[in-house]
């Protein structure tokens, strides 16, 4: 389990990723790690929402509640630090470069006031092999005043050599729609 006090800067994230790049493959599990995947969990307690960043998010994405509450999709933005720590940890088997965000599911369980302090956690849930490489699911959770207020699952793809070469890519350039997916669910 990894605990962080604050999110690392973008520069620090990139420098750490560059240092680890030679030892980590894309889209393949190293033979010695295939059966010894360690659990990864990162927590970041006491996160305050930056009002300037929240206002920028609202300007770009809009806010259905008139700006009084945190928009349902915003908490994911707070997970840059915990997610970076997870994919840069020694236990994560793939290169952080080339990871592609392929799917997101979020659930707002109760309204989040912009002034509340959040406790964030993310953990590796599953790694599965697909024809395009390995998909990695991370579960994210934001607690406000000791109660779960928001959760989500992010799916990242580490493409294998075949997928990186463009084999199997759609000729018309259209991205396929994922049928039956409900990427957002609000209970409030």
Tell where the protein language model's regions lie, with residue ranges.
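Generic alpha-helix signal with a bias toward terminal, lower-confidence helices
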Residues: 61, 86, 112, 118-120, ...
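Hydrophobic beta-sheet segments that form the core/acyl-binding groove
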Residues: 99, 103-145
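Hot-dog-fold acyl-thioester-processing enzymes
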Residues: 1-103, 163-168, 173-188
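An exposed, glycine/acidic-rich loop-and-rim segment of catalytic or binding clefts
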Residues: 128, 133-188
């Amino acid at each position: 389990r990894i605990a962080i006090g604050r999110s690392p800067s973008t520069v620090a994230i990139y420098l750490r990723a560059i240092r680890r790049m030679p030892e980590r493959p894309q889209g393949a599990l190293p033979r010695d790690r295939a059966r010894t995947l360690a659990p990864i969990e990162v927590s970041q307690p006491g996160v305050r929402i930056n009002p300037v960043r929240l206002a920028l998010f609202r300007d770009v994405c809009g806010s259905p509640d008139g700006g009084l509450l945190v928009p349902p999709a915003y908490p994911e933005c707070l997970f840059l630090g915990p997610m970076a720590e997870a994919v840069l940890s020694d236990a994560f088997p793939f290169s952080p470069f080339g990871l592609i965000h392929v799917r997101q599911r979020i659930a707002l369980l109760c309204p989040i006031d912009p002034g509340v302090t959040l406790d964030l956690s993310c953990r590796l849930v599953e790694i599965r092999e697909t024809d395009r490489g390995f998909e990695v699911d991370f579960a994210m959770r934001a607690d406000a005043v000791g109660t779960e207020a928001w959760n989500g699952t992010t799916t990242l793809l580490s493409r294998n050599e075949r997928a990186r070469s463009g084999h199997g890519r759609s000729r018309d350039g259209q991205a396929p729609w994922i049928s039956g997916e409900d990427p957002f669910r609000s209970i409030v």
